[in-house]
Amino acid sequence: MIPSKYKLAPPDDLHPYSESERAKHKIYPDFDPWKHTKEEDEILLNFVSKGYYSTSKVNFESISARSSLQDSLPKLSSTLSEKFSEVVRIREREINTIKGNSKDGMAASKFTDLCGPDFKLPSRLTLTDHRKELWLQELSSPYTPLHKITSFIPHGLKRRQVLEQCYIKQIPLKRAVWLIKCCYSIEWKTGIAKYANSPQEKDKFNAHLLKEWTDNFVHILEKLIFEMTQHYNDSVKLEAWKTEVSYFLKLVGNCYTLELIDKNTFHFWILQFVSKVENFEYLPLPLHILELFWSGICNTNSTKVNESESNPLYMVTKLTDILLNQYYIILHSKSMINDDKYIINDIKKNNSIKESLLASIQKLICILFKQQSLEVFLFPPTSWEKYKPCLIQITSALYRKSDEVAEIKRKLELISYRNETLKYTPPISENKVKDDLILTTFTENSGSITVVELSQVDTGLTGALDDNATDFDWTSYSDQEISTKIQIIQIILWAIHPSRHSHYEAGQLAAKLLLLKINTMDGFPEYEIEDEIWSLVFKLAKLSDKSKALPAVLEALYSLLNTLIVYGLIKVSTYIRKLISSGILYLTESNDKYIHCRLLINLKMSPLMKSQYNMVLKNVMDQDPEYYNNYNFDQIVSIVEDLKVKLPNGDAIEYSNYPMSVKISLGEWYLTYLCNGKLVNETRESLTEKYVLFAHQLNTNHLYFKWIEFIVYHQLIEDIETLEYLMEVLLRYKKLFSQYINDHVLFIKTFIFIIRRILKERDSIAYSLTSFMDFWKFIMKSYSLEIRADTDLRSEMSAVYEEEKAKKEITEGEKDSWMGLYQNIHPDSTSLDQNHTGFSELFLTNLKTFLSSKQDKQAKKKARYNLLLLMQAKNRDYSKFISIYLKRKDFKTSDLVNLLSSKLLTLDQIKNTYGLKYVLELFDIESESNCVFYEYQKRCYIELNYKSVLSEYNVVSHHEMNRFIFKIVNHSTSAKLKETASALLTKNLEANKDKAIQLFYQLVYYQNNLEFLSSEELQEFAVNNSPQKLYSYLDFTNLWLFQSFTKFYIHETFQNTNEDKVKVGDVIFSIIETTKYNVLCAKIFEDIRDHRVTDLVIELFEQDFFKKIISGEEFKAEFLQMLIEIINHLSMHKGKTNDRSGEQSHTSYELCVQVMAHFQQLSDSELSAKEIELDVFMKIFTVHQNSVFQEILRDTESSSAMIESLFALFERVNFSLRLKLMFYEVLSSLKSYCTYEAGISDEQSRTKLMHKLMCLPPFQVSSFFPEEDDTDCTRDPALSLGLDLGTASANSTSSTTPSEGTHKKRCAIWDKRLHKYTGELQRKPYYCIKNYQDTEDINNCSLNLSLFDARYERNNPR
């Protein structure tokens, strides 16, 4: 309803305002009527008549909206994504494009021979609009003879106008086709006269004209389809629209048959249009159009022999991908009408629409499945994961309708194998080679080192955890990358390992990832993760005895387990039950029960578990009564109660004497006490006191962040100084900010409100002198997506930035602009002496006051503001006098720390005065726990100047070596810093070769124990052990260190032995034996950049493996798994640095031929027993595929033997479909390589070779399954995928398998009189034609080109 105009009169009984407010305001309270606009009226009427409905951003209110605000892919993969997107664009632009019909001769005009010699095209005549309309009406009337109106065609009818008039006037189809052909012919005749002497230009014009007409057909068809939704509420218009669409489809069909449309372009448009339809309302009509032109797209009715004349295979592959994608989208959609104006309440109707669309698409996919090559069902891995269940569901319909059940199941199995079992899948055996986790402690005279050995290691996960950028999308990462329980174990071990103790966020990050994984659709159940965690705890307890309990590990473990208990992921009751049932408590000689008791004492305990808790402690009273006497449940409750009295009174408490359970209980109580008490504003001193208590003494960071949220949301911040300290804390623990603060946007908005609306007025002087730019930069970097999505926050952040810039301009401006600040600080002072002496006196006086311990807080605060004003207003003078102050050395170390914490001094100023060495010595002095900004500044400075910092240490000195190692372990927390540290570590190892073992052993020992060994202990270890001994300490936490050491050690061995392969091989195999075939061995060579060393390592492993196969030696499964990973990693690493990634030495090639012959000589049963070795051999073969193919093309005797062996093994390997596919891939790639690679001189030998390869059967079911097994494709368990494909009839049979010779095309002359073929034609194959031009490798990948939708046109070489 639109409000009308009215006047307001003061109410009779309303009391007026007070006299003081009557001057400028109305006497009575009043409000203005709504000043509406035309647009608002339309919106109002629309909502009143139709209602308002807004779709939710997520499916359920309990689901986080983060996924809708942030990008789905992690930012670390953005570069890779861009590269692959560029590849796809290039492929679509250069390869998968319709290039016209000039090559096929279809671009030639269809009107070259129109009719007899007397035939003439109608002439063009200029008519008025009225007469043109009459002419069109006569043409559309079936009662008007055609010969009366065919003498001329009106001007203005061209292309789109002709087509539009045809469906608008409903011109009979025969007349419409005549009009189109005439207009086309007139246009062609006019244009072809320009290019009479240029056949090349004539062909271009023909192709261009045909494409122009095709584009106009497409344009009108698109327009008609999208007009559908405009006529929902008008039945008359809707009926007229149906008539127009029906007519135009018939017209398109006729022109399509008469080849007035470029078929390839039209087919491509149909596929693109079906793929881009997102609104399900439009989908039925595109599907109908697809069915109309199905035979043309799929070539089902083609009788052409020449493959190049048919549609490319990629078009059918694209069609398959589009249909499966649409099927997947519809299957997972809840509503079939995606429009705000519609709400489907009728579930049956919605399901009916959904089933109808699914049935239409299912029918088309089934046709493709039965009629097309299996290659059209090959997809990228990400797409296959989506399409696999859909394809199984679709083909299940064929089981009920078809008798060829076995054939269908075989096709589906072959497609599944082809998509899932690529060449570099993990080998080999289905049996587990090792336990998931093995913890080993190596004890030396100097100490012990615990090594963590995992059956599988995700190095990418370790890198992501180490980096842990504040803006990293862990939600997407956990959903996409974390898929196994061994990764869960790896996350927990990373969080509690001593080498990661500098990651203050480790425990909270691990808990967050476990929580995210549980909440994902394919996540693990809670009880499974809880079982894994407690199993890990039991394994850790076995490592240590009573005297040494790995304190660095256990402290982090206490914190992590308590965090998981808070989130409800684990329960202490479950732990106690497992502990009692294990029987560990009743073993008198068991030392790990003491670890369990200590762990239990440090866990937060519920009163319900009191009896079980006390029972566990009582079981060890005979060996150690201290646990029960000091830490029984009642005693812990009593301790907490005593501390509750002491803490508010400010009594001195030694918190380090109490277990973690006491600290957590006390911290929670104190937080409740603060929040429920009288609310007072927080000052810097009180905030610092609580920071020291929660973060350092109680080790409960999560409680301190809760307190921060409380005081921010309640606006309990006294002044700018307090706010500045709060920002320093948030910067110091910025990686916890994103994890502990629940609503980042609300928190930031409240923060800005406090600064701009409250503290800016309350404490204007401090606001003008204090810079918050570092904090705002952190917010902008970490929460850019949230800021972009929230317009209010974006505008607030812009205003904050402008104010920060304005502050700087005021203090750096003219005298009048900052003199006001000085007058506000010193209201009693009248002027400021601007001469040099005045500045000196002011600087020294305020500096002395600030550093004096006798001055009160207010005087120090004023002195700091004076110094800040001097620093900003006269920066050059301030830097000069601060340098003089430093050079006098009239200060204590604590004074420098105080100046740095107060932002009155920078580390660069100290470095410029005393050098970097002095700065590093200052860092080694432990500061007080409340120096938050100093700790943040120190860490940022080290990371920013990391290379210079590490280069400053001379590792020859034992003390300098320890400081160098300390910096590496504590600050190499990102990939960039690790790369810098790795380069400098290698450099120091090379410069101090005599102390290399000592340096690296000290590094590994400190990383594991956080303690340094003495120089005598290091010397003793270096004398008694070889460098290979160090590799026994390899695990996922120190892999990057061993990569640096391996680079140094292998290069040193390579040079000292004069490149002796035997000696280098002895060293390498000794390293492998020392690690006991650790899965990480494949990655320790990655830092080696010298391709000679890399080639040698690959050659040594290959030749050793080949010789052992020939000699018949048995292999350990761990060795085979490690072998193939080493060769794959090194080969791929070489491919990134040079183009020789696939080269193989001649010796290795000869051994490869011998191995093939060896496998060929084995019987079927022996060959089946060697499946694992054959699998590894074929993977190695594919690594050097191009190199091997080049050897084969030289046509040596060994090459012929190689091909014979490949074909023989391909025929015999029926026990493993994966291996059979691998042989097929190799042969198929060899066939492509030989076909298109030039340079063979002997044509006869080439013909013989190609004749053999041309007999390779096509990719179909009969090529991979023997005929005698057709009746039951699931008989052999090795060929089963574990798919639920339905039950097949035992008597069902498949189609007859064609013989090998039927795949070869033959040509002969057909005698019509005798009705038989006579005189077979001998055609010289195109691949036997000489080509003297050099070409590049066309198949330098391990997979067949058909996987990538690539296709080569069969044209003679130029």
Swiss-Prot record:
Arranged from A to Z, the UniProt key words for this protein are: Activator, Nucleus, Repressor, Transcription, Transcription regulation
Question: Do the record's keywords include Transcription regulation?
Answer: yes
**Any Pfam family:** Med12
- What is this protein called in UniProt? Mediator of RNA polymerase II transcription subunit 12
Origin superkingdom: Eukaryota
Give the protein's function.
Component of the SRB8-11 complex. The SRB8-11 complex is a regulatory module of the Mediator complex which is itself involved in regulation of basal and activated RNA polymerase II-dependent transcription. The SRB8-11 complex may be involved in the transcriptional repression of a subset of genes regulated by Mediator. It may inhibit the association of the Mediator complex with RNA polymerase II to form the holoenzyme complex.
| UniProt-listed GO biological process terms | negative regulation of transcription by RNA polymerase II; positive regulation of transcription by galactose; positive regulation of transcription by RNA polymerase II
Origin species: Candida glabrata (strain ATCC 2001 / BCRC 20586 / JCM 3761 / NBRC 0622 / NRRL Y-65 / CBS 138)
A single GO CC term, please? mediator complex
Quaternary structure, per UniProt, is: Component of the SRB8-11 complex, which itself associates with the Mediator complex.
Q: Name one GO molecular function term.
A: transcription coactivator activity
Q: What is its main location?
A: nucleus
Task: Identify its protein family.
Answer: Belongs to the Mediator complex subunit 12 family.
